[in-house]
UniProtKB/Swiss-Prot annotation:
Naturally occurring in which organism (per UniProt): Pyrococcus horikoshii (strain ATCC 700860 / DSM 12428 / JCM 9974 / NBRC 100139 / OT-3)
Cofactor notes: A sodium ion is seen in the structure; a metal ion may subtly affect the relative position of the nucleotide-binding region to influence enzyme activity, and could increase the stability of the enzyme.
Protein residues bound to NADPH: F10, T12, V13, R40, K57, S92, S93, S114, K116, G296
Reported function: Catalyzes the conversion of L-aspartate-beta-semialdehyde (L-Asa) to L-homoserine (L-Hse), the third step in the biosynthesis of threonine and methionine from aspartate. Utilizes NADH but not NADPH as coenzyme.
Catalytic activity: L-homoserine + NAD(+) = L-aspartate 4-semialdehyde + NADH + H(+)
EC number: 1.1.1.3
Keyword Oxidoreductase: yes
MF GO annotations: homoserine dehydrogenase activity; metal ion binding; NAD+ binding; NADP binding
Enzyme class: oxidoreductase
Full protein name: Homoserine dehydrogenase
List of residues binding L-homoserine: E200, D211
Active site: K215
Pathway(s) where this gene product acts: Amino-acid biosynthesis; L-methionine biosynthesis via de novo pathway; L-homoserine from L-aspartate: step 3/3; Amino-acid biosynthesis; L-threonine biosynthesis; L-threonine from L-aspartate: step 3/5
One GO term of the biological process aspect: threonine biosynthetic process
């Protein structure tokens, strides 16, 4: 059976996802068929070569430079209404993408996303809309990239009371703090992170804790089914001694906090490089510890791809 997919956003993650789909287009008896791709230059829609699209984007910077295919200038809402995919995949950084999700879910189209603000800010509305229209919304890669903390909370710990989550969920600040502990200044560490493509498009989202805040808010929604009442956010700009310091997101019922914390040398959150880690404290299991890579195109795309498979298996009507 064939599942038609629209990819919205064709940056590093989108292109890595295209590569994975090309490698594994037939899986669990399902054929994954990408029928449209959208970047800032427009939308290609129809029977095109996925890897050719990837190569054109990488070599020219614009999907619209692809050869023999018509390029459409759809609005995000028009994209959903005209293309009518079975699954809409958002791997963009568009903060207002929830409006597109609402159109898709209202049409019974499942949504897979790695985009944090729409889930953090509109979780309840989107989940209810999905339920009303027998669709799904999947967002594993919004937190810890491909390391499956969302799946663990939504599926594997359903019988547990989540007492607290402590997590290092921003790989960029971990990299920067690691470099600062080796003697680099904040500015020099930021420049090195930029040169390696580790930082977000707007570095302030990482440095000021905004990215980690969105992730903490998503973890609160998933763990407790409601928004936090208390919020605290402090970035890493004021850190002077970075030795054993990490930007830690702490989530408990009604409260989220994101701020730098000095950790003991045996703390599982004291990860290096671009690693992420989380300690989930539960009533029966005690501490559940997750560690894994927290960024990178292929790593994030892996989580997105897993969500695409989950969507096809959970909603047979897609096929």
């Amino acid at each position: 059976m064939k599942v038609n997919i629209s990819i919205f956003g064709f940056g590093t993650v989108g292109r890595a996802l295209a590569e994975i789909i090309a490698e594994k287009s037939r899986i669990f008896g399902v054929e994954l068929n990408v029928i449209s791709i959208t970047d800032r230059s427009g939308t290609i829609w129809g029977d095109f070569d996925l890897l050719e699209a990837k190569e054109v984007k990488e070599s020219t910077g614009k999907l619209s430079n692809i050869g023999d295919y018509e390029v459409y200038n759809f609005s995000p809402q028009e994209l959903v209404e005209e293309v009518k995919p079975n699954i809409l995949v958002d791997v963009s950084s568009w903060d207002e993408a929830h409006e597109m999700y609402k159109v898709a879910l209202g049409e019974g189209i499942s949504v897979v996303t790695s985009n944090k603000p729409p889930i953090a800010n509109y979780y309840d509305e989107l989940m209810n809309l999905a339920k009303e229209n027998n669709a799904g919304i999947f967002f594993e890669s919004t937190v810890m990239a491909g390391t499956p903390i969302i799946g663990v909370l939504r599926e594997n710990l359903l019988g547990e009371n989540i007492k607290r989550i402590d997590a290092v969920v921003n790989a960029s600040t971990t990299f920067i703090l690691t470099k600062m502990s080796e003697g680099k200044t904040l500015d020099d560490a930021i420049e090195e992170a930029k040169s390696l493509g580790i930082l977000e498009e707007d570095p302030s989202k990482d440095i000021d804790g905004i990215d980690a805040y969105y992730k903490a808010k998503i973890l609160h929604w998933v763990s407790y089914g409601e928004p936090p009442e208390e919020e605290e956010r402090l970035g890493i700009r004021e850190v002077r001694d970075a030795r054993n310091v990490r930007l830690v997101a702490q989530v408990s019922k009604g409260k989220i906090s994101v701020k730098p914390r000095k950790l003991s040398s045996d703390n599982p959150l004291l990860v290096e490089g671009v690693q992420n880690a989380a300690v989930i404290r539960t009533n029966n299991l005690g501490e559940v510890i997750l560690k894994g890579p927290g960024g990178g195109g292929r790593v994030t795309a892996s989580g997105v791809f897993t969500d695409i498979i989950k969507a096809t298996l959970k909603f047979p009507n897609l096929r």
